[in-house]
Structure formats: C-alpha cells, structure tokens
Regions:
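Active-site-proximal N-terminal segment of extracellular/periplasmic enzymes that hydrolyze or transfer
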Residues: 1-41, 45-47
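Short catalytic/ligand-binding loop motif for oxyanion handling, primarily in non-cytosolic enzymes
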Residues: 14-18, 49-57, 66
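Acidic, metal-coordinating catalytic cores used for nucleic-acid/nucleotide bond scission
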Residues: 47-49, 73
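Catalytic-site neighborhoods of secreted/periplasmic enzymes
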Residues: 56-91
Length: 91
C-alpha cells in the first residue's frame, strides 16, 4: 500500500507567525501536520506570483520553460499529477 500524499501550499504565510519561538498564531492543525508529516524548512518559490509559482511547481520547470505569464495554470506533459497517476495514485 502506498503512503498518502497531502500537498499543502501556503500562500502569504509568514513562518515567524505560525512556528518557532515568536509564534503569534494559533494553528493546531498545521502544528500537527508539521509534527507528523514531512516539513521543508528551506523552500524557495520559482516566481513572485502565486499562479506562476504553482505552475512551475506542478510542471517541475521554471516559469521561463513553461511559458506561464498569465493567471492560468497550464499543465505540460509528464507533470506532477501525471507522475502520481502513473504510479497508482488517485487524483
């Protein structure tokens, strides 16, 4: 049986507000996800806009490769979701 994959992308969250010693937000569910899941502390966005950045993430390519310049996600062949489907995951 394959492990579940839960992909959570948080837009406009400040790490200092919901984690660490200076935490000022009450986020029990995010706290639980971070404790029991895989947490990446050093992720870097591919672009300054949400849609362009998500498009880069889902296609595993930088924006200049995908040609994304608008507010629409365009999935190329062999994208993140295709890879999951090809490996038996249900999307």
């Amino acid at each position: 049986m394959q492990p579940n994959i839960f992909f959570l992308d948080l837009d406009s969250f400040r790490a200092d507000k919901f984690m660490g010693v200076s935490k000022s937000s009450i986020t029990p569910n995010i706290d639980r996800l971070m404790k029991n899941g895989t947490y990446f502390s050093q992720s870097i966005t591919a672009a300054d806009g949400t849609i362009i950045s998500l498009n880069a993430t889902f296609n595993s390519q930088f924006p200049f490769r995908t040609g994304t310049r608008s507010e629409k996600i365009i999935l190329k062949d062999n994208n993140y979701f295709d890879i999951l489907k090809n490996n038996g995951y249900h999307i």
